[in-house]
């Protein structure tokens, strides 16, 4: 059993991380999960949350707003809609994300399908909870 796996975190703007890691905690849409070496092959969608990476330099965290994670036995690739290292997140970043979520929620209220409204409301609640979790 290998002790590490390749981890890549990519957003539309840039490659944020590419390194060997021992574990990554993923905010999955169906619940949090931890990817480790020799994990069963899995693809999951992400919900807004904090991605925690345990690498050789210690632990690093990234704020993600959604996307996909592809887990394999020896690698994990995360394609994030938006991703920001937690150390770089400011109140302005968070306010922008909350404003986008609020706008999506308002737009969804006109939809006939309640699931669209519910999803938008959940996104807004997740964004506001992230600010509290991060102390912003």
UniProtKB/Swiss-Prot annotation:
SUPFAM superfamilies: Epsilon subunit of F1F0-ATP synthase N-terminal domain. Gene3D superfamilies: F0F1 ATP synthase delta/epsilon subunit, N-terminal (2.60.15.10). GO terms for molecular function: ATP binding; proton-transporting ATP synthase activity, rotational mechanism. Pfam families: ATP-synt_DE_N. F-type ATPases have 2 components, CF(1) - the catalytic core - and CF(0) - the membrane proton channel. CF(1) has five subunits: alpha(3), beta(3), gamma(1), delta(1), epsilon(1). CF(0) has three main subunits: a, b and c. Keywords: ATP synthesis, Cell inner membrane, Cell membrane, CF(1), Hydrogen ion transport, Ion transport, Membrane, Transport. One of its GO terms (cellular component) is proton-transporting ATP synthase complex. The keyword Ligase does not apply. The keyword Phosphoprotein does not apply. This is ATP synthase epsilon chain.
């Amino acid at each position: 059993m290998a002790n590490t796996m390749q981890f890549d975190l990519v957003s539309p703007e840039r490659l944020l991380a590419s390194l060997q890691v021992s574990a990554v905690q993923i905010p999955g849409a169906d619940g949090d999960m931890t990817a480790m070496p020799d994990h069963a092959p899995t693809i999951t969608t992400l919900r807004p949350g904090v991605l925690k990476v345990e690498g050789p330099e210690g632990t690093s965290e990234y704020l993600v707003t959604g996307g996909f994670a592809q887990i394999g036995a020896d690698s994990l690739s995360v394609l994030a809609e938006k991703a920001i290292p937690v150390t770089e997140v400011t109140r302005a970043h968070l306010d922008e994300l909350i404003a986008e979520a609020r706008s999506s929620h308002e737009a969804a209220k006109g939809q006939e399908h309640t699931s669209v409204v519910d999803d938008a409301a959940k996104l807004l609640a997740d964004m506001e909870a992230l600010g509290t979790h991060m102390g912003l």
